Swiss-Prot record:
The gene is HHO3. Residues 178-188, 330-344 have a biased composition (Low complexity). It comes from Arabidopsis thaliana (Mouse-ear cress). Residues 206-266 form the HTH myb-type domain. This is Transcription factor HHO3. Residues 237-262 bind DNA. Residues 90-122, 156-212, 306-344 are annotated as: Disordered.
Length: 344
């Protein structure tokens, strides 16, 4: 009886261990199923081991006599020799507490190692960082304000003027400019705050279009267009530009050149070059009805009177009457030029 009891106890313990072994394999199977694509071979081995263990358990329950063989087969076929190469098998119940403690101890060691590594990294980082700047602070760039005078003139381009020295630089600079004597009370006040506005104005001046340089060939086309249109007082800038057919030429440029040309044509003719012995004030005369009168441009206070010369002898009186009826222009050609003597 004692033999049977001892045999029953061994059989029940072995069956219990086999059930625990199957449960551990099932837990591992659940873990591996998450990584089914990455670990297909492991999953297949675990499933085969679980099936073989269950098969042996069912056979051993039917045949009580072969319990020793079942235990040996289950341990050999399902045994951990195959799985110890892949992963450690987790035993349940009694050994679970020990494994949990071991895992907690490993986790604490890992945490302490990570903290130590983090402290080392922080210390290395603090050593590598430079806490002060060796280079001195840059000096502030103090730009003096610039003053630009604004004048109302007809010129298209105004050059920059040099800065005038001022007594107080901190006070705002205000420059008031009066335009011309014709305007009574109108004045323009221009205040420039700093170098920023000066740079903007300088950039705007540099971005301006360069003035047109009228070459002799371009001026010749201009004169040819004026001749076709009937003169400078009749032609318009747009018509002149269309006739000239020059790339890049604008109406404003043609208009400016036309105004200059009109002013040039209105000027009187330049006086004849004088020698050293002549009077520095050139005397100009004009003829009116056969009488010579000095022009208004002369600044001399003398009075001139014509001195008649002896006319040529004519044969008939009809020629005299015809000659007297001629215009001053024709009479000046036929008669002798009278000599002028200054009267004081």
């Amino acid at each position: 009886m004692m033999m049977f009891k001892s045999g029953d106890m061994d059989y029940t313990q072995k069956m219990k261990r086999c059930h625990e072994y199957v449960e551990a394999l099932e837990e591992e199977q659940k873990k591996i199923q998450v990584f089914q694509r990455e670990l297909p071979l492991c999953l297949e081995l675990v499933t085969q081991a679980i099936e073989s263990c269950r098969k042996e358990l069912s056979e051993s329950s039917e045949h009580v006599g072969g319990q020793s063989e079942c235990s040996e087969r289950t341990t050999s076929e399902c045994g951990g020799a195959v799985f110890e190469e892949f992963m450690p098998i987790k035993w349940s119940s009694a050994s679970s507490d020990e494994t949990d403690k071991d895992e907690e101890a490993e986790k604490t060691e890992m945490m302490t190692n990570e903290n130590n590594d983090g402290d080392k990294k922080k210390s290395d980082w603090l050593r590598s960082v430079q806490l002060w700047n060796q280079s001195p602070d840059p000096q502030p760039n103090n730009k003096k304000p610039m003053v630009i005078e604004v004048k109302r003139s007809a010129g298209a381009f105004q050059p920059f003027q040099k800065e005038k020295p001022k007594a107080a630089d901190s006070q705002p600079l205000i420059k008031a400019i009066t335009p011309t004597s014709t305007t009574t009370t109108s004045s323009t006040a221009e205040t420039v705050g700093g170098g920023k506005e000066f740079e903007e104005q300088k950039q705007s001046h540099s971005n301006r279009k360069q003035r047109r340089c009228w070459s002799p060939e371009l001026h010749r086309r201009f004169l040819h267009a004026l001749q076709q249109l009937g003169g400078s007082h009749v032609a318009t800038p747009k018509q002149i530009r269309d006739l000239m057919k020059v790339d890049g030429l604008t109406n404003d440029e043609v208009k400016s050149h036309l105004q200059k040309y009109r002013l040039h044509t209105r000027r009187p003719a330049t006086p004849v070059v004088r020698t050293g012995g002549e009077n520095p004030q050139q005397r100009q005369f004009m003829v009116m009805e056969g009488i010579w009168v000095p022009s208004h441009d002369t600044t001399n206070n003398r009075v001139y009177a014509p001195v008649a010369t002896q006319p040529p002898q004519s044969s008939t009186s009809g020629e005299r009457s015809n000659r007297g009826c001629k215009s001053p222009a024709t009479s000046s050609t036929t008669t002798h030029t009278p000599h002028l003597l200054p009267l004081s």
